A protein has these predicted regions:
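Low-complexity, acidic/polar, glycine-enriched regions of mature
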Residues: 18-198
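Bacterial Sec-dependent N-terminal signal peptides
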Residues: 1-25
């Protein structure tokens, strides 16, 4: 009887040990279908555009997002709200040392660290991540709508950052005086949509 009891206990422990082991699937982000749109603002006007994802992986454990990382091709940053001539002029400025200095820092890196449930719906999550721009890393926190079916996923988020934390101070009223209507707000907004390759 004692032997049977011990055998049963061992069997139960074995089942639980297997059940508790994480099973991480590294799911590839579709660079063709995923998008990042940016919005930058001055006192009197906004500008918007896009920047491309170079590559990315999201980590899924039994249908839950648990981590991930994707790189952003800063050399692809482009403006979309003006004429071609004006767009190219602003693109060149965004790529130089005043802003993202893409020749020296061609990639930005986004690393997801922790994910926890948020209010706002069954698919709403609060995500804490590290964002590296121009070799400078700072944490960012935001709410994302995440949907996962097997190894298919979609994640949508609106992320706002203070650009000056990444040493992007050009035209900032926090560092320069008497800018008038040439002052550029410190906040940059990114609308991010990530989709899986599957």
């Amino acid at each position: 009887m004692k032997k049977i009891f011990l055998t049963t206990v061992l069997a139960i422990l074995t089942i639980f040990s297997f059940a508790s082991k994480p099973h991480i699937d590294n799911v590839v982000v579709s660079t063709e279908n995923s998008t990042i749109k940016w919005i930058g603002s001055k006192i009197s006007e906004n500008h918007e555009g896009t920047v491309n994802i170079k590559k990315g992986i999201l980590m899924i454990d039994h249908g839950k997002l648990v981590g991930g990382q994707f790189s952003i091709d800063m050399q692809s940053i482009s403006t979309t709200d003006m004429s071609d001539k004006l767009n190219k002029k602003l693109d060149g400025h965004l790529k130089n040392e005043d802003f993202f200095n893409v020749e020296e820092f061609p990639l930005a890196i986004f690393t997801i660290n922790t994910i926890q449930k948020a209010s706002g719906g069954v698919n709403s999550f609060e995500i804490l991540a590290d964002l590296t721009i121009k070799g400078i890393t700072h944490p960012v926190t935001f709410i994302s709508t995440v949907k996962i079916e097997g190894l298919n996923f979609s994640a949508i988020a609106k992320i706002k950052i203070d650009r000056t934390k990444w040493n992007i101070k050009y035209g900032s009223g926090s560092f320069f005086e008497n800018l008038g209507d040439k002052m550029i707000l410190d906040k940059i907004e990114f609308d991010v949509t990530l989709l899986s390759v599957n």
